[in-house]
């Protein structure tokens, strides 16, 4: 049977005409596999900032509704270019602006939430084999004014569309090829995580994982949408963010290398429950101990987890004390590895 796939492309993925052509190749590869394909695009990188600057030159107290009207033009440009390119390379495609679907939002300008997506026309268009290219980051409110969804609004758009059209897959293309234990742009020994639960992802996001905003992960969790995070720059497998434990039988990742200033701490046999990682890391961060890389291996029985993370060597004694004092966690073994 036909799969429905939602593909979302971030600003750097559509940041130039060359990149847009590359993105259209990616889109066409999904379409050739006989999928129904829905595309969500952000504005070309840099464009939104230019628009923000223009508004500041007009007034440092720029009208909020006009601000959203101004900003929403960014995605209109990228979606028209993508749809135009798809047509050029032989695929039926058209752009859909948020108000044409419509995507209905509630809440204040610049921080609206998507309430519902009226998807009937869109579904009909998908049945004809067309590829809709939809503006991320925006919608219309009950007064028919354009609204924007705040940070990472395009992810929210993708997740809500996936929900309302009952998509089989939601794939978020970005400039990193998945979720890493720490920012791969800063640490070359960051490890990619193949599969991660929403709850762990929420903890990772607060640990500075730049891949997805916590609100988007929360949306995905609430609506039970599995998300694949991939890079549009390299064709490598990404990270699956999911809630189904069936995918967890294979061990996620094993081992992180500790560097000369880092110490590695492994806590084995931690009783696995939602938020367990947070209850370990919170006291550490409150005491200014920076947790750098986190690796979690769920045990085969699914009830326990092994947690490995790195901290600065100087913090080792302090960290050990906080873990041992922590009444919220039970574990079997605590070990340290210092280079």
Task: Describe these PLM feature segments.
Residues 96-98, 230-232, 294:
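Conserved beta-strand termini and adjacent loop/short-helix elements that scaffold enzyme active sites
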Residues 126-141, 204-228, 263-265, 269-273, ...:
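Electropositive, surface-exposed helix/loop patches at the edges of structured domains
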Residues 186-191, 196, 206, 216, ...:
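Acidic, glycine-rich loop-and-beta core segments that form the ion-binding/anion-interacting portion
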Residues 1-217, 297:
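Nucleotide/pyrophosphate-binding catalytic subdomain
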Residues 161, 167, 219-225, 229, ...:
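Structural preference for solvent-exposed beta-strand-turn elements
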Residues 41-48, 180, 229-246, 303-305, ...:
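Terminal amphipathic helices with adjacent charged low-complexity linkers/tails
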Residues 169-173, 227-229, 292:
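Short hydrophobic alpha-helical runs that function as membrane-insertion/retention elements
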Residues 240-339:
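A conserved regulatory-domain signal marking ACT and ACT-like small-molecule sensing domains
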């Amino acid at each position: 049977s036909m799969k429905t796939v939602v593909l979302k492309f971030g600003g750097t993925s559509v940041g130039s005409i060359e990149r847009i052509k590359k993105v259209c190749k990616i889109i066409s590869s999904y379409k050739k596999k006989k999928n129904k394909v829905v595309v969500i695009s952000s504005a070309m990188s840099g464009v939104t900032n230019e628009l923000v600057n223009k508004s500041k030159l007009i007034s440092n107290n720029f009208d909020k509704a006009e601000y959203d009207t101004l900003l929403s033009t960014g995605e209109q440009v990228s979606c028209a270019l993508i749809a135009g390119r798809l047509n050029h390379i032989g695929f039926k495609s058209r752009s859909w602006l948020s108000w044409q679907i419509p995507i209905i939002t509630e809440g204040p300008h610049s921080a609206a939430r998507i309430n519902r997506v009226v998807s009937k026309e869109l579904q009909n268009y998908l049945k004809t084999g067309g590829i809709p290219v939809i503006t991320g980051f925006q919608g219309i409110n009950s007064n028919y004014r354009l609204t924007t969804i705040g940070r990472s609004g395009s992810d929210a758009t993708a997740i809500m569309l996936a929900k309302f059209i009952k998509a089989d897959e939601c794939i978020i293309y970005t400039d990193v090829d998945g979720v890493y234990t720490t920012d791969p742009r800063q640490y070359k020994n960051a490890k990619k995580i193949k599969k991660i639960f929403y709850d762990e992802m929420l903890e990772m996001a607060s640990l500075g994982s730049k891949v997805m905003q916590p609100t988007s992960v929360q949306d995905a969790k609430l609506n039970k949408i599995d998300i694949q995070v991939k890079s549009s720059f390299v064709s490598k497998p990404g990270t699956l963010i999911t809630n189904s434990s069936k995918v967890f039988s294979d061990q996620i990742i094993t081992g992180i290398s500790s560097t000369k200033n880092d110490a590695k701490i492994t806590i084995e046999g931690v009783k696995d429950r939602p938020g367990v990682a947070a209850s370990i890391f919170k006291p550490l961060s409150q005491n200014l101990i920076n947790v750098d890389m986190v690796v979690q291996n769920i045990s085969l029985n699914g009830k326990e987890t092994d947690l490995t993370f790195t901290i600065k060597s100087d913090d080792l004694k302090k960290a050990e004390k906080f873990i041992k004092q922590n009444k919220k966690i039970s574990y079997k073994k605590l070990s340290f590895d210092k280079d």
